[in-house]
Curated annotation (Swiss-Prot):
Residues 340-600 form the Protein kinase domain. Its EC number is 2.7.11.1. Transmembrane segments: none annotated. Residues 279-323 are annotated as: Disordered. GO terms for molecular function: ATP binding; MAP kinase kinase kinase activity; protein serine kinase activity; zinc ion binding. Coiled coil: none annotated. The modification Phosphoserine is found at residues 43, 257, 329, 490. The modification Phosphothreonine is found at residue 266. Residues 284-297 have a biased composition (Polar residues). This is RAF proto-oncogene serine/threonine-protein kinase.
């Protein structure tokens, strides 16, 4: 029991435990780990003089090849005298043993921490680690992090830094003073907590006291960058620790009483899941887990067969834990409905109603016309949101999130400008030809981007094209096939969607299971070009909606191209005619459309700046010269 207490208090110093987990007496294990002890030199023998006896001091050799001299006062125990020296080095007296060095015969005698310190004035003491403490030394290497990584000390970006090959601790060079002294052997800790060995028990059975999750939550502190590093067991090597001088960043060996600044221990991260799993297994078993000091030492050196088995299954365990810990990335794009404040209703369309709202600024909220969505619809909606959230383009409205509570809704950026439909058919804005061509180019550029992402708009029209901050085109209401289709049971059934004036003939006929395609978006874009180049809507002479559906679906009517502006370029007229062809396969795709409009823009005549200087400047220059000539003094001629 004492060994378990000492080990837990050791870990509490490194992991930031605010309160002691165990309460009891000090460790009294007869076993000692000699590899951590201070190696005395021959020159150190006989250095203790009579002055040290008269000054009431003791010389103490500490782990990690350090030493110090402590003052002794009357009434102080050995524990009280050495507490400060051990604390500044990140050590706990409960996990160490103290010995008195004997000169003749040469050896050492184990002392109790409660021994009166006055009886040891002038003596030489040695402090060693107990054998059940699962610690090892770091194995630092310099590493260039090509992938995104952060310092475990300051949480800042890493590029050229250091990393421990054993525990994975990574840090900047200027953060090395805060690196924990000892490397935590996580495989031993996990084996101790989860796989105790009840067969090797000496001196009776010892049980692990129960811990509440409240105390664990209060004591464990997990930095963000360390949550993944210790989330899976690591197959550490169990070789003898190398000397500290080889892994302390090339710092010279300290021989004075001042502690090595590169070895000062600080709060180290620990994954709470390790302790939670141990508590869960402890509570489910119904009987206490038996632990002993021998169990600690056995966990430190497992059998070769066990190590080979653990190494072979490490990949499978890592994949299982990672799969369990991952969360759907679309979860972070879902917005809580109570955080969005709706202000005014902007309008309604074929698939929903648009409101202006407030969510960290002005946003547009489109509440979709889907009542009581089924689990299949919700999953399909989330799948499409996962595609929409990856769209980033200057001519595309920025997708900001979605909502599923009460109603399905999407949140996009707010566009201050009006729609192209409002400019052309309500405000009757008079655009110049080069402005109309530029609007057509930006629209084609945005649609080309969507098609490159395999997103079909399905509702391309002038109402969904917005002029933002001047003449910057923003395309909205794209994608969302889930809400633009009719559901029959758990299957999607295509239905007549969109405004009929911009619908392609094959979409109106609905003869195919999925009539929507890149070419159907091209047809809708062709109608938008017709609006730009005429300032009118197509089929204005037909008043009956059903008649338009019948005639367009059968191919009996096409937009009247004779109404195009007289100054419309011939290339633009051909592009409008090609985009609204009856046969789907005869229409061009947006890469071809975009290149055609860009060539047209370059061929348009431009007003070049005159190379002549302004006459005002020349007149002023001439006036200055003439004034100088008039004011010049003429010398008399003799």
């Amino acid at each position: 029991m004492e060994h378990i207490q000492g080990a837990w208090k050791t870990l509490s110093n490194g992991f930031g435990f605010k309160e002691s987990v165990f309460e009891g007496s000090s460790c009294m294990s007869p076993t000692i780990v000699h590899q951590f002890g201070y190696q005395r030199r021959a020159s150190d023998d006989g250095k203790l003089s009579d002055t040290s006896k008269t000054s009431s001091t003791m010389r103490v050799y500490l782990p990690n090849k350090q030493r110090t001299v402590v003052n002794v006062r009357s009434g102080m125990s050995l524990h009280d005298c050495l507490m400060k020296s051990l604390k500044v080095r990140g050590l706990q007296p409960e996990c160490c043993a103290v010995f008195r060095l004997i000169q003749d015969p040469k050896g050492k005698l184990r002392l109790d921490w409660n021994t009166d310190a006055m009886s040891l004035v002038g003596a030489e003491l040695q402090v060693d680690f107990l054998d059940h403490v699962p610690l090892t030394t770091h194995n630092f290497v310099r590493k260039t992090f090509l992938k995104l990584a952060f310092c475990d000390i300051c949480q800042k970006f890493l590029l050229n830094a250091f990393r421990c090959q054993t525990c994975g601790y990574k840090f900047h060079e200027h953060c090395s003073t805060k690196v924990p002294t000892m490397c935590v052997d996580w495989s031993n800790i996990r084996q101790l907590l989860l796989f105790p060995n009840p067969n090797n028990i000496e001196g009776g059975s010892h049980t692990l006291p129960s811990l509440t999750m409240r105390r664990i939550g209060e004591s464990v502190r997990i930095p963000v960058s360390s949550q993944q590093r210790y989330s899976t067991p690591h197959p550490f090597s169990f070789s003898t620790p190398s000397p500290v001088s080889e892994c302390s960043l090339s710092q010279r060996q300290r021989s004075t009483s001042t502690p090595n600044v590169h070895m000062v221990s600080t709060t180290m991260a620990v994954d709470s899941r390790v302790i939670e799993d141990a508590l869960r297994s402890h509570s489910e078993s119904g009987s206490p887990n038996n632990l002993s000091p021998t169990g600690w030492s056995n966990a430190k050196a497992p059998a070769p067969t066990h190590r080979e088995k653990a190494a072979s299954s490490t990949g499978q365990e890592k994949n299982k834990i990672r799969a369990r810990g991952q969360r759907d990335s679309s979860y972070y794009w879902e917005i809580i409905a109570s955080e969005v404040m709706l202000s005014s209703r902007i309008g309604s369309g074929s698939f929903g109603t648009v409101y202006k709202g407030k969510w960290h600024g002005d946003v547009a909220v489109k509440i979709l016309k889907v009542t009581d969505p089924t689990p299949e619809q919700l999953q399909a909606f989330r799948n499409e949101v996962a595609v929409l959230r990856k769209t980033r383009h200057v001519n595309i409205l920025l997708f900001m999130g979605y909502m599923t509570k009460d109603n399905l809704a999407i949140v996009t950026q707010w566009c201050e400008g009006s729609s192209l439909y409002y400019h052309l058919h309500v405000l009757d804005t008079k655009f110049q030809m080069f402005q109309l061509i530029d609007i057509a180019r930006q629209t084609a550029q945005g649609m080309d981007y969507l098609h490159a992402k395999n997103i079909i708009h399905r509702d391309m029209k002038s109402n969904n094209i917005f002029l933002h901050e001047g003449l910057t085109v923003k395309i909205g209401d794209f994608g969302l096939a889930t809400v633009k289709t009719r559901w029959s049971g758990s299957q999607q059934v295509e239905q007549l969607t969109g405004s009929i004036l911009w619908m392609a003939p094959e979409v109106i006929r609905m003869q195919d299971n999925n009539p929507f395609s890149f070419q159907s978006d091209v047809y809708s874009y062709g109608i938008v070009l017709y609006e730009l180049m005429t300032g009118e809507l197509p089929y204005s002479h037909i008043r009956d909606r059903d008649q338009i559906i019948f005639l367009v679906g059968r191919g009996g009517v096409v937009p009247d191209l004779s109404k195009l502006y007289k100054n419309c370029p011939k290339a633009m007229k051909r592009l409008v005619a090609d985009s609204i062809k009856k046969l789907r396969d005869e229409r061009p795709l947006f890469p071809q459309i975009l290149s055609s409009i860009e060539l047209l823009q370059h061929s348009l005549p431009k007003i070049n700046r005159s190379a002549l200087e302004p006459s005002l400047h020349r007149a002023a220059h001439t006036e200055d010269i003439s004034s100088c000539a008039l004011t010049s003094t003429r010398l008399p001629v003799f």
